[in-house]
């Protein structure tokens, strides 16, 4: 039934009842009926507007034609993304704690991995396919006190490309944990100096990547996960 039909029926009912009602009692009844009719019409009109403009009614799921629905569970989305990229080359190697005095990378430790063609040869990661890669590495230095000569710590990631076979630094950082010498007789306080580097690069199949430092004797192996090197295909 439309809103106009409802209003017309209410008006007809008012005319019939107003003819039958008489005197003060009839006027009072007519007034109550008019108020009730007004509220009924107002309510019906409001309900019609809400239904017409879709303010109330069944909920419709918003979906994007080029992507997952907005109410899709996050876990399911992450799982699908992980499955879609499971065939991409990836590697995460950690420092070999059994090789003191030098930075040697290993892939047989906990939390280390190599997958989908990445190889570790001669302390270098070998790229299996052309593409964009995220390259990252972190080292942590530790020492006690500061020497009389300046102490500089460097961390460098280099690339040897198959196309020109020349070692080129693609990421490099330098830090100095000591700003002045520890006075003679003073307590040698410990210091820590982390260096993290990362960037995205276009690599070719067969490229070799290395992560090196200049002061391996200051490396801190006290905790696992402090010194690592890795690549992820994007």
UniProtKB/Swiss-Prot annotation:
The record marks 34-35, 39-40, 49-52, 78-79 as: Cleavage. Residues 57-233 are extracellular. Residues 89-234 form the THD domain. SMART domains: TNF. It is found in: Cell membrane. The chain crosses the membrane at residues 36-56. A lipid is attached at residues 19-20 (N6-myristoyl lysine). One of its GO terms (cellular component) is plasma membrane. It is a single-pass type II membrane protein. Gene3D superfamilies: 2.60.120.40. The modification Phosphoserine is found at residue 2. Disulfide bonds join 146-178. Glycans are attached at residues 81, 96. PROSITE patterns: THD_1, THD_2. InterPro entries: TNF, TNF_alpha, TNF_CS, TNF_dom, Tumour_necrosis_fac-like_dom. GO terms for biological process: extrinsic apoptotic signaling pathway via death domain receptors; immune response; necroptotic signaling pathway; negative regulation of protein-containing complex disassembly; positive regulation of apoptotic process; positive regulation of canonical NF-kappaB signal transduction; positive regulation of extrinsic apoptotic signaling pathway; positive regulation of JUN kinase activity. The soluble form derives from the membrane form by proteolytic processing. The membrane-bound form is further proteolytically processed by SPPL2A or SPPL2B through regulated intramembrane proteolysis producing TNF intracellular domains (ICD1 and ICD2) released in the cytosol and TNF C-domain 1 and C-domain 2 secreted into the extracellular space. Keywords: Cell membrane, Cytokine, Disulfide bond, Glycoprotein, Lipoprotein, Membrane, Myristate, Phosphoprotein, Secreted, Signal-anchor, Transmembrane, Transmembrane helix. Residues 1-35 are cytoplasmic. Belongs to the tumor necrosis factor family. Homotrimer. Interacts with SPPL2B. This is Tumor necrosis factor.
């Amino acid at each position: 039934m439309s809103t106009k039909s409802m209003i017309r029926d209410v008006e007809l009912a008012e005319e019939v009842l107003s003819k039958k009602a008489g005197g003060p009692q009839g006027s009072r009844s007519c007034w109550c009926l008019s108020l009730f009719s007004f509220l009924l019409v107002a309510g019906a009109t409001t309900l019609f507007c809400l239904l017409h403009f879709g303010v109330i009614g069944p909920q419709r799921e918003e979906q994007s034609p080029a992507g997952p629905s907005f109410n899709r569970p996050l876990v399911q989305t992450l799982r699908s993304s992980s499955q879609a990229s499971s065939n991409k080359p990836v590697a995460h190697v950690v420092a070999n704690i059994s090789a003191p005095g030098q930075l040697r990378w290993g892939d047989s430790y906990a939390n280390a991995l190599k997958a989908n063609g990445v190889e570790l040869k001669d302390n270098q990661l070998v790229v299996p396919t052309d593409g964009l890669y995220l390259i990252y590495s972190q080292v942590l230095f530790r020492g006690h006190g500061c020497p009389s000569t300046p102490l500089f710590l460097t961390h460098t990631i280099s690339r040897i490309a198959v196309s020109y076979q020349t070692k080129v630094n693609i990421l490099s950082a330098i830090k100095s944990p000591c700003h002045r010498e520890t006075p003679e007789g003073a307590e040698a306080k410990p210091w820590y100096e982390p260096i993290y580097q990362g960037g995205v690069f276009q690599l070719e199949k067969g490229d070799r990547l290395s992560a090196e430092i200049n002061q391996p004797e200051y490396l801190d192996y006290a905790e696992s996960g402090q010194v690592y090197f890795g690549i992820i295909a994007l």
